[in-house]
Amino acid sequence: MKIQMLKAIVATTTLAALGLGATAANAATATATARAKILRQITLTNTSDLQFGIIVTGVAASTVAVSTAGVVTCGAGLVCSGTTTAAGFTIGGTTGQVTTISVPASVTLTNVALNTMSASLLASAATTTLVANAGSFTVGGTLSVGASQPDGDYTGTFTATVNYQ
């Protein structure tokens, strides 16, 4: 009886071992590669402000436009003088990477008496490719000057945003 029980244990152990071996024969392996691309943190620096210059108003509403190249166009009924510039920005980042540029559609300029004017904004490019870890763009705009616009120094701020594409 002991011999039969011993034979049964050996047979069961052998079958179990054979079963485990059969599973291992059906196994497969594959390898994968882990990758990461590190980009420099983007920096954005304002190098010049959008300057519409000195404007003498008339009795009718008109506009003053400063192109992205800084060229001024003075609307009918206005007298324009002084320095005009497009806003300038420099971008720092990783060479060869494309960046997207966005600016708000407009900015409100306000004087100390809380009188306002609105200027539409336009960036010189929607994207730029960084060369030697750098790029740049400008922002021009068209200022809407009201009829007999109250005098004063008007200012407003806007935020330009740059991201990797």
Where on the chain are the PLM-derived regions?
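Bacterial N-terminal signal peptides that target proteins for export
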Residues: 1-12
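Generic detector of short alpha-helix boundary/capping microenvironments
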Residues: 4, 15, 128-129
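Alpha-helix boundary/interfacial micro-motifs
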Residues: 19-21, 122, 158-159
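C-terminal segment of classical bacterial N-terminal signal peptides
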Residues: 15-26
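Surface-exposed binding patches on compact interaction domains or structured appendages
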Residues: 102-126
